[in-house]
A protein has these predicted regions:
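Aromatic-lined ligand-binding clefts that engage carbohydrates, nucleic acids, or primary amines
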Residues: 111-114, 469-471, 591-593, 597-611, ...
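Short tyrosine-centred short linear motifs in exposed loops/low-complexity segments
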Residues: 387-389, 501-504, 595-601, 638-640
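Short beta-strand-plus-loop segments that form exposed binding edges in beta-rich domains
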Residues: 644-653
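Short, compositionally stereotyped local motifs that mark structural "simplifiers"
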Residues: 444-544, 552-556, 562-586, 598, ...
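Extended carbohydrate-recognition surfaces in non-catalytic/accessory domains of CAZymes
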Residues: 48, 52-99, 104, 528-595, ...
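Mature catalytic domains of secreted/periplasmic carbohydrate-active enzymes
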Residues: 28-453
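Bacterial N-terminal signal peptides
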Residues: 11-22
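Bacterial N-terminal signal peptides that target proteins for export
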Residues: 2-13
């Protein structure tokens, strides 16, 4: 009896624990949703990069490629860079005008550099004299004026703040070219300074919408420090939103991260737009020309058409668009920036309903443009207006109650339906030469059938290969073929995983009530012979490496260069480097793999890299870029294979990691236990 009571009590406690855990997850999710609500509705914001770097305006000693990074890209000593402060006197700065320009453009929030990597502060900090009030003749707290004006005009004020600080004596590491001593520097003391300034920013200027961190990539910063800073900021302003650059979870310029394990509320793609949505909150930040800070010689401006279509593209994928302006040292927005923002505002005044408070497209692909959604409403953003007056909307199953032009609601549009698509009879001329918007209204939430998905670990295989088919809708059947023919109503319908033994072309299509309601999707899976393993090689643990000095924009031909150093390392790592910039490594050796399989190799690097197995280049991640991951696949026989990895670093951030995975190996850094080098006898 006691045993039975104990079991019942244990079950009750287990169920209670599960319920409490579920409730905690729901409450946590609801809290974040409430906090993120205004940001998700806004969709469009203004980024401002402004500081002492506006004084040289991108030019130093005849070179005109610089901007906000000029201290390090032009290698200007800190004491010399400080001389820009007395020259920074932006007497034409007008907070009211800046906010009006953003508001008229249709932007809902402003993010400005309170401090960039150069360490100079645009606010009155009590922790340093290296700020706009104490170090410049301007003597005005720019952040105070902007925050007050944003509140007056109904925009959210947000801060960009750099974790990296090239000016502060306790920040480490020093720049590779610097002669400034690091003796006595204390990074923990710098963290206290960083936290102190963050506290000033989130307690002295009222409610702040977003704290947009940056400069987190150097090895003195880590995930724990990022998590601590995230929690600290939220303790000061619980409703503030913080980007993913507070910690170390960001995957380079792609800006992606795992929101379940890394600190931050949203991803930050930089100068790029993801090909699809990311499954979590994200915001693309982008320049109008080629620089963030003001560069007087940069006239490579994106067109208004390009910028408006980028805004639509980003919104259709569930993201926000943070568009940058780099003001002059006088305090003015460059005229080309003003012109483009005004043109975007003109479009937004007519079409803003299709951007604000919308969610991502329900369609997998629209050849003529993009789409956004609201409850019981779809917005069709037409880039390419049909010359024949017929706009085909593939996948739209639900019948609309009405259809009309957003620019002219009185212009009604007729629709007729075929299985799996709607056809709209539109006016001959596009209402807008850049993007025309059509509104579809429904009684209930619209049903859109996406193309079926064909999923597998890889497009090539050497062992029996599993393929899965899926649809976004219920009450449908996926019919498929494996012989290259198109599916019909008589083709088998998908019920379980398909196993392939030979090269096969899989075709599938979604059916409902005996009729096809989607396009045919095709994917070919190729059976390949794995690369033969090397035999009779005498091996020792480790890898050969050669180390080089030089300035490159892409991987050089290392056969033509003399190395500075060489030796043996246990894995792919660059700790033996002698400088922080302008160096390269070449690693050679062999990798052992446990079984015949398709292996995926990944290289994360900043700057360029490549990975080869034998003579085949598997990963090409070359060129100048921020931290970026590239990958490639190759079928390998169990055993030993030659591997070569090359990497170069030009300037700025540095990153280098090599991973692999297979159908039975989860993605991981290639372990030292799998890496060897052949002895001279073997060579």
């Amino acid at each position: 009896m006691l045993k039975k009571c104990f079991i019942v009590r244990s079950i009750f406690l287990l169920v209670l624990f599960c319920l409490i855990s579920s409730l905690f997850v729901v409450c946590k999710s609801t809290e974040k949703d409430n906090r993120m609500a205004w940001w998700r509705e806004a969709r469009f914001g203004l980024f401002i990069h402004w500081g002492l770097y506006a004084v040289p305006a991108g030019e130093w000693e005849g070179e005109t490629r610089h901007a906000e990074w000029i201290l390090t890209t032009a290698q200007i000593p800190v004491k010399q860079y400080e001389k820009f402060a007395p020259q920074f006197n932006p007497v034409k700065f007008d907070a009211k005008q800046w906010v009006e320009i953003a508001k008229d453009a249709g932007m809902k929030y402003i993010v400005i550099t309170s401090k960039h990597h150069d360490g100079f502060c645009l606010f009155d900090s009590k922790l340093t004299d290296y700020d706009v009030v104490d170090a410049t003749p301007f003597k005005r707290d720019i952040m105070k004026e902007l925050s007050e004006e944003c509140r007056k005009q109904g925009l959210k004020m947000c801060w960009y703040h750099s974790i990296m600080d090239w000016h502060h004596p306790d920040y480490l590491p020093r720049r590779q070219w610097e002669k400034r001593s690091a003796e006595g520097a204390d990074f923990n003391r710098y963290i206290e300074y960083l936290k102190g300034q963050v506290k000033e920013l989130v307690t002295n200027y009222g409610e702040i919408g977003v704290l947009w961190f940056d400069g987190e990539w150097e090895n003195t910063w880590d995930q724990q420090k990022g998590s601590d800073l995230y929690k600290y900021v939220r303790s000061l302003q619980p409703n503030i939103i913080i980007n993913n650059r507070v910690g170390k979870g960001r995957a380079g310029m792609a800006g992606t991260f795992d929101p379940e394990t890394a600190a931050g509320d949203f991803g930050t793609p930089e100068q790029e737009i993801p090909s699809t949505g990311l499954g979590y909150d994200w915001e693309t930040c982008m320049t109008m020309n080629d620089h963030w800070g003001y560069n007087k010689n940069d006239h490579n401006w994106k067109s208004t058409k390009d910028l408006i279509r980028k805004l639509v593209d980003i919104t259709s994928k569930g993201g926000n668009f943070l568009l940058n302006v780099g003001p002059t040292a006088e305090g003015l927005f460059p005229q080309p920036s003003i012109d483009r923002l005004a043109a975007m505002g003109k479009w937004m005044k007519i079409n803003g309903e299709s951007i604000y408070r919308t969610t991502a497209s329900l369609f997998s692909k629209l050849d003529w443009g993009r789409s956004t959604a609201k409850p019981q409403k779809l917005f069709l953003h037409v880039f390419d207006w049909p010359e024949n007056g017929k706009l085909h909307v593939p996948g739209l199953v639900s019948k609309a109650e009405s259809a009309y032009l957003l620019a002219d609601p009185k212009t009604k549009i007729d629709i007729y339906y075929k299985y799996g698509e709607a056809v709209l009879s539109v006016p001959k001329e596009a209402p807008d030469s850049i993007v025309s918007v059509i509104v579809l209204e429904f009684k209930e939430e619209p049903e859109v059938v996406r193309e079926p998905e064909i999923k597998a670990e890889s497009d090539i295989f050497c062992n029996p290969h599993e393929v899965k088919l899926s649809s976004n809708l219920g009450n449908v059947k996926i019919r498929y073929t494996l012989d290259g023919s198109n599916p019909t109503s008589g083709s088998p319908f998908y019920q379980k995983v398909i196993t392939l033994e030979k090269t096969t072309t899989v075709k599938c299509q979604i059916y409902r009530n005996g009729h096809a309601i989607s396009n045919v999707v095709t994917k070919t899976f190729k059976k390949v012979d794995p690369r033969k393993a090397e035999k009779n090689i005498d091996l020792k643990p480790g890898l050969y490496y050669k180390y080089y000095h030089g300035k490159w924009e892409k991987l050089p031909d290392f056969n033509l260069i003399e190395p500075v150093d060489s030796g043996i390392v246990t894995r792919f790592e660059i700790s033996t480097k002698e400088r922080k910039e302008d160096f390269a490594f070449k690693f050679t050796g062999v990798i052992t793999v446990p079984e015949n399989d398709v292996y995926i190799f990944y290289v994360v690097s900043d700057d360029g890299s490549s990975l080869s197995i034998g003579d085949e280049v598997v990963v090409d991640n070359d060129g100048l870029h921020g931290s970026k991951e590239a990958f490639g696949r190759i079928a390998l026989q169990a055993g030993t294979h030659p591997i070569t990895v090359e990497f170069f670093q030009r300037s700025g951030g540095v990153d280098f990691e090599v991973f692999y995975s297979s159908t039975k190996i989860t993605k991981q850094i290639i372990p030292s236990s799998s890496l060897f080098y052949p002895t001279k006898k073997s060579n």
